[in-house]
Amino acid sequence: MASQDRGRDRSSRRLTKKRKDIGRDTRGLSLDIPERFKDGDDAQEDVTAPKRSDAMSMNQSIFSIIARAGGQSQVDLGTMQEVDSGDSDDDGKGKTLHDRLDGAARLSRLRTANDFRPPQEDSRAEKIGSGKHRRALSENKLLRSLPKLKISSRKDVRSDGQHTDQMSSSQFLPPRPSTETPSETHKRGDALKGKARATTGDEIHVEKQRKSERRGGQGSSVGLAQSRGPVSLATRIQQIFEFEHAEEVISEYPCWLLQSILLQGYMYITQKHICFYAYIPKKHHDVSKTGYLYKRGRSKYNRYWFILRGDVLSYYTNPAELYFPRNRINLQYAISAEVVENKKKGEYETIFTVTTDERTYQFKADSAASAKEWVKSIQKVIFRTHNEGNSVKISMPIRNVIEIEESSILDFADTVKVRVVDNGETFAIDEYFFSFFNRGQDALNVLRIMINDNEHHQVSTENQVNPTPITAPLKTSNRHSLVVSPIVPDDTPRIKENVRATLSPLPNPNVGRSSISDISARSSTDVPRKSWDVRRSMDASRALRRSSHEVRRSFSGGRSEKLTKSRAPDRSPLSPAADTESATLSLDPGTESSAAIQSMDESSASASQILNRSDVFRAPAIHSAGVSHSERPQQAARHSQDTTRSSGADQHLQLLVRPSKQTNTSLLPASTEAEEDTDPSQTLPRLSNSSSALQEIASYPLQKASGIAGFLRMRSKEMGSLLATESMGYYEKVSGMLAGGRKHYNTADGLEPHDQIHGIEDDDDAAKAADNFREHFAFPESEILQSSFFASLQRMLPNYGKIYISGRYFCFRSLMPTSKTKIILPMKDIENVNKEKGFRMGYHGLAIVIRGHEELFFEFSKAEYRDECAITVLRILENTKYIEEASSSSGVDSDDEAAKAEHDLLQQAREQSDTHEQIDVSEIARAADHDRIPLIFDDPLASFVDFKPPEPLTIVCLTIGSRGDVQPYISLCKELLKEGHKARIATHAEFEPWVRKHGIDFAPVDGDPAELMRICVEHGMFTYGFIKEANSKFRGWLDDVCSSSWRACQGADVLIESPSTMAGIHVAEALEIPYFRAFTMPWSRTRAYPHAFSVLENKMGGGYNNMTYQLFDKLFWTAISAQVNKWRRRELGLQNTSQSKMQANLRPFLYNFSPHVVPPPLDWPDWIRVTGYWFLDEGDTYQPPADLAAFITQARKDEKKLVYVGFGSIVIDDPAALTKTVVDSVLKADVRCVLSKGWSDRLATKDASKPEIPLPPEIFQIQAAPHDWLFKQMDAAVHHGGSGTTGASLRAGIPTIIKPFFGDQFFFAQRVEDMGVGIWLKKVNTSVFSRALWEATNSQRMIIKAKVLGQKIRKDNGPQVAIQTIYRELDRARTLVKKHVKQDDEQTDEFEEDWTMIEEGQDVDVSAHHFEAQSPLVGMNQDAPRTGGGSLVLGSMVMKGAQKRNSESAYRD
């Protein structure tokens, strides 16, 4: 393989020949590659290399001598979590109700609910879920193909560590050969797409449970299939709210639910229910608001740039440095956002706070209006994240409604307050506010009529009995502890149905009163509520550290549930036991602890309430030191995902309760007993006293310092009472560093039962490490730690720390005393891992390739640790990234689609109703804005703006180069013609027939592309040799290109140019028209990728990548500036320009490659858009020759793999040698080949139609065929790596082998290899080429990755995205147009030009820049630029410079 050959080639520079041969022999057939593919004598040859001794490719050009320039930057990603310095982040800790809760205690606050599905539907969903579970990992072909972790001796490590440094993932993680038939392989490959993505370790069971819940727990996905006939509104409401029977709809009203926001929806009043429904699509990645704010630190406010994107509020020290977020606030855990009332009169309220379940953040805006806008935006996000799912549903049984009354909470609408009994257990009372902007009185009258005769109202009227029940001392419920339960009076009607809602109502104003009768009137937090799957309210007590999309919410029924036996008793923040940090202290199970009786709104309880509790006067019981409150990872997974519910009769909590003297045992339910899995032995001390244990260990000889470190680390909990907490933290860090190495906390996925793994930890260490891991990175209990490694993050200086790997995250935490760096990198953002040489002698490097971001470099002390880390990450990537469910890759997407379908169906049914009326939303919005109430609209298209220009435009596309450079513009222009515009392509004359065949106007551009290609191949793109020959031979060629481009663009309204043309930006300036750029390779400055012309074999990091763009721009402009400026003065009538004046980096840019192939870097501004490939599909009408069709059919019949080989119209010195190598490689790999031999078509001295050597029957030669048809017939493709050809082969979903020759081909070869969907050939010879062919056609890992990528690319619509981007950016492009005024005062012009040149800091002779008088061409005004009318003064020039600098702010040179 190419990467294998590259590894040996690079090793040869530092190893002797003997060591290299040993490396080959020791590796041997460990890659499961047949014996015949071992390297031959030609392994170091390259038949495509130029024969000239002075030839220099771009990989050996000037960029290669600038190694690791700028060092490795401080990487942070969007996910970097860095503990702030003391001056900005410590303030506010300890101010909330939850700052003393650990992760387990927070999780125990989670109150799950009964599933709303009927019992028979439960069983049916369970059967469906079990039937759709993925196969066991041992049966998974993709995972089974992964190699076993090899147990190597130290000697093996020393012998193999060096030559494996440069191995790619395809080499150190190869597939095992499959024994299946090709047909079985094909079927099983297709079957993988239908399987749900597997996470690793113990999370597999969790994932299975989640999937089954998603299928059955969501009302929108049950019984909502589209029917052929119209469905009545009553039937649709029955389906959505899951009523037992269809109920007649008495009335429906558009209304707004009033909570922290004003939510638009509809109220439906049926015979038995009052229902509310609103659709709120979640915006996971949209930027809601940006701007500067002050954030409160310890002693002062610090100013940062804030970005509210999705549900994360990030802030930056420098807005231009998107790689270095100061910190991120996850609003999924936020509780409230509010403006702080200013106590000083006359001063504006500019301070606002955001409260999470851990702390309170304080911010200060520049104005009161800005503060309110930020609060409104954050409140919207909080509401979205706290609502269960993508729709708000409230179903209130009419018989539960106690009171309907008007409210004056809003001045601009009629507001109705509905008080309703929540459930039959506690008789808690909820309040909901609904605002009506139309027909409010009608709604109020109907509601009053409907509830006038309900049983609650009658009882309250006749008996004058307070509906709030008397409470009993003890009663079990679905809380994790014992709670107060009401004793229902005999004359109180029984609640047969509970209120069901996906969000919590507003807090009741009676919560804080001391009367015990007011306990029932609570803020919906004392008593557990049933929601969709996992209930989370807007109150502080209900905020939990878990993601809003982590578990699917489901609309709920009853109020009681049965907890799993793995759950621990809850603990309140005010619990006496919560005051200590020791894990050995807990409450006696028999006491009425604060967790057992106290509500989570206890912060507002009065002194009499607190003293009224009997357990206040008792000391907390202390359990034995051996009992740990933390759970095993398996238990934690069940704990975090236990959403099992029942919809039948009440099922009480099973708790181990020891009655005390103060407790009336007669009130305990008879069913209360010990849990089934309670082990009596666990209540006894498992370990002796820490000091005696130390004496015992001291009796043994101390052989290793790491042994003591490990022992002390195991006893850290027991020694917590002896050492100070802060000192213990330093001790744990040091002891961990002393132990070093790596640790695995469970068996890796995909291993066979007899496989072994280094460093496996026992259960005690694994549990403690998992707890520490979740504490460091604030992960939920469901996040299971799998492995950890000690390594150094390579920056300017190595940053020593610890790598943590779980099923979903790759994390790093610095252990350096002065560093607080943390990295939290989702596994889904990792593309690949590459082994590299270490930066330091004796260290071994690992590069993490990340989507849209520069690589992360880590150094390990041993190659063994580096290899295990790489294999661990790759196994997780295989599980989570490439085994996708057919319907959706994540639950979030499927939830969004289900909610949208539900919304559409309900809207269709509502439109059939006569009561449906339109409301003027603008009036409501203005009124709400006056009161500063944030709005959420029901219509997801309410914010859509049509950017399409009213008049058709003449759009010219200017490009030079090969056929691959022209083809994307033909596809774009065809779509522009459909939009009603006039399209024209300006390029080389040889492409005119092809362009005009598609009905597109054409204009010729001079220049011979064959000559340009020749010097590119011989010298490399824009190397010193290229520039030298271009200056000596192609000055006239550049003049012809510029002049012909100027003529071809006359009459254009918009110009789209490939920047390689070099003339377009100047033509657009002269014509004063909007200018866009479009290209097939990265041309905009970024740290994620190097410039396409400066790709090296090694990953050099973000500093090098960014430098290549600056250096290239400087060299490129220096080479052409003199000639271009001369042409500007002579033909365009423009003055000289420079890089800063052109503002090229501020121009809108369209990249016509897929975002799945080249993910947009995080540091690209929003005017740069990766649109997707602009494919030109010509295969629909293509009829293949009969002999080609017969060749393909015969290959399938013979069960032989088909490969395409074609390197385009390249120029090489020895085409015969290349042909012979291709023939020999095809025969050796035992495949069939379709050959497109164009490597001697240009500048050849003989007829290229005659083959240099005879072709065997296994090879079929073609002249041309559409790629979109041909690649569908192939199993793999080999080509030169042009953007269009690469896109075509990747869209077909086949592995791609690339042998780059010049230009951007090296870049796409690297991308294909990084994604794991192909191979980058460094050399072409029989040994390397044949091995690459065999791997591309037999590696199931590569085949499946390519297939998945092809599916994603086929979903793109690049031309349409490009057109919409043009529409959106057209106004911005117009603002960059420089207006010119006709010259009429030569002295003023000279004077103005002189000022401009002084601004650039250049000494020039003013007399040397007189313009040559030229007659303007038709349609062109020969103007000269002016900075203003009349005479100039120094002040005007200063203002001009200031405005210019502001316009080029963050993305200029």
From Swiss-Prot:
Q: Which UniProt keywords apply?
A: Autophagy, Cytoplasm, Glycosyltransferase, Lipid biosynthesis, Lipid metabolism, Membrane, Protein transport, Repeat, Steroid biosynthesis, Steroid metabolism, Sterol biosynthesis, Sterol metabolism, Transferase, Transport
**Domain GRAM residue range list:** 235-282, 771-837
Compositional bias segments (type: Low complexity): 513-524
Main EC class the enzyme belongs to: transferase
Record-listed E.C. numbers = 2.4.1.-, 2.4.1.173
The subcellular location is: Cytoplasm; Preautophagosomal structure membrane
SMART domains assigned: GRAM, PH
Major location category of this protein: cytoplasm
UniProt keyword annotation of Nucleotide-binding present: no
Question: Which GO cellular component terms are attached?
Answer: phagophore assembly site membrane
Write out the coiled-coil annotation as residue ranges.
none
Bias (Polar residues) ranges:
581-608, 660-669
For this protein, the record's PANTHER family field holds:
STEROL 3-BETA-GLUCOSYLTRANSFERASE (PTHR48050:SF25)
Q: What is known of its domains?
A: The GRAM and PH domains are required for the localization of ATG26 to the preautophagosomal structure (PAS) and are involved in autophagy.
Q: What is this protein called?
A: Sterol 3-beta-glucosyltransferase
Which species is the source of this protein? Answer: Phaeosphaeria nodorum (strain SN15 / ATCC MYA-4574 / FGSC 10173)
Q: Which gene encodes it?
A: ATG26
